[in-house]
Amino acid sequence: MNKNTQGKPSGKPVRRDGVDPVLRSRARRRAVQAIYAWQISGGNAQSLIAQFAHEQAREIADLAYFEALLHGVLDNRRDIDEALGPYLDRGIEEVDAIERAVLRLAGYELRYRLDVPYRVVINEAIESAKRFGSEHGHTYVNGVLDRAAVEWRKVESGH
């Protein structure tokens, strides 16, 4: 077994920093689902975290990252929504619930998780929007995040 995959649940190579990209992708997908459920139910964030964390653990995904994403979005929702505002063509609450969950998650990662390259954030958001959202939701998500990334990650995006 390759030393880069030894003991890693996905069996795929990990980056030098020890991050398994497959597990991170799973954590993001589950976080989108949890954010969506939270938006729809208006329920208790802690019970949603507990429910999804239990399911996350069964899938051998990156539980710590899932929890960090979910707490990050819920704790910073107002800031994220306000920051996304100039890049939206309508109010955040008028955006489809799935696309809104995807945008909030990606907005959190773009603003607060500078260790994650902006292209990774955008690509993962597009994939989540394709998987869970409406037929053309991914193009909307891409447009919003491309414009936001230029401002929020100027050094990284080269602008």
Curated annotation (Swiss-Prot):
Q: Can you supply one Gene Ontology CC term for this chain's record?
A: cytosol
Q: GO annotations under biological process?
A: DNA-templated transcription termination; transcription antitermination
Q: Which residues form a coiled coil?
A: none
Any idea which UniProt keywords this protein has? RNA-binding, Transcription, Transcription antitermination, Transcription regulation
Kindly list the GO molecular function terms attached to this UniProt entry: RNA binding
What does the record give as the function of this protein?
A: Involved in transcription antitermination. Required for transcription of ribosomal RNA (rRNA) genes. Binds specifically to the boxA antiterminator sequence of the ribosomal RNA (rrn) operons.
Record PANTHER family: ANTITERMINATION NUSB DOMAIN-CONTAINING PROTEIN, N UTILIZATION SUBSTANCE PROTEIN B-RELATED
Family statement:
Belongs to the NusB family.
Q: What is this protein's record name?
A: Transcription antitermination protein NusB
Q: Which organism is it from?
A: Stenotrophomonas maltophilia (strain K279a)
**Primary gene name:** nusB
